[in-house]
Amino acid sequence: PYFAPPRVERSEEGTWSLDARADRLYATMSEVVRQHLVADVPVGLLLSGGLDSSVVAALARRHGPVRTLSMGFADSGLDERPFGRAVSEHLGTDHEEIVIRPEEIVGSVEEAAWYVDDLFGDWGVVTTMLLYRKCRDAGVKVVLVGEGSDEVFGGYPDFASAGGAE
């Protein structure tokens, strides 16, 4: 194969109690978030109000003031702003809401295709490009997100059937 990840042997961590594992996870995540907040440019956090981004925002808030941004689509049911706003109010973050209009999406397809340099059938490419541009325009140069926990913790149904998850 082109690439095969190295096999990791079980360590003594495999015998830790659930509480010890939870403590280790919390300490590790908190430290990683703290490290990613260190920058010489403004840092923001995309806050959907879901579990992933809310956990990252809560951990970041423990280290000081946090700027959060939530996205919504004009005239659409796909609007994360109310959920992000609720979490922001609970955590006391400096919050901004970003709206993406349908005409912005349609008008940006060609540009997004140029950046991707490939055919794509996922509108998320266009909206993600617009979202990050609006973050930049709002003065946020570094953006933390809450993506990845489903992959790490087996949050997708397909992962449960993959086997090996304990």
Where are the model-predicted features located?
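ATP-dependent adenylate-handling active sites, centered on carboxylate activation for C-N bond formation
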Residues: 6-166
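Non-catalytic substrate-recognition/targeting regions of SAM-dependent transferases
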Residues: 1-5
